[in-house]
Amino acid sequence: VLKALGDSLHLDALTVTGETIGQLLASAEIRNPAVIRPKSAPWHPEGGTVVLYGNLAPDGAVVKQSAVREDMRAFRGRARVMDSERAALEALGSGAVHEGDVLVIRYEGPKGGPGMPETLAVTLALAHSGLRRVALVTDGRFSGATEGPCVGHVSPEAYIGGPIAGVEEGDEVEIDIPNRLLRVRNTDP
């Protein structure tokens, strides 16, 4: 991997061996170019993870776009608001979450969690629920195993008064990965 990135590295930087990165890479070879591809021929034109911004995440939110089906990369849905992962799991288990919903889980961020616990249980439950058009938005975090339209690290978080704290049941939430947007529209008359 370092050999493929060579021209982007500081080749004169010392390594723990006492040699520079350039010296170490001089004899390195890429054995399988189908696996370690050159920058000129990437698997995808963009990285797997991107940052979204908008009125729901003025300081940003993270989504693993490489794990989101093409038909879900631009999605609008009705907010189903939960103040904990446990409440979200109960809602999924009771059948209260339906196609077209956006499950909004708040107060799971660094201060609200506290400690920003991983919201793995709800992402697994959602992945195995059979629901194909449901998204998840949280100020909590995900593991690398998360798949589907799961937007995490919404910042600022609910606990410190971030916009996610003001999302109400039934509000329209828009996730637009190609345009890097995460927005909410209040649906009160």
Task: Provide a role label for each language-model segment.
Residues 1-189:
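Catalytic or ion-coupling anion/metal-binding cores of large enzyme and transporter domains
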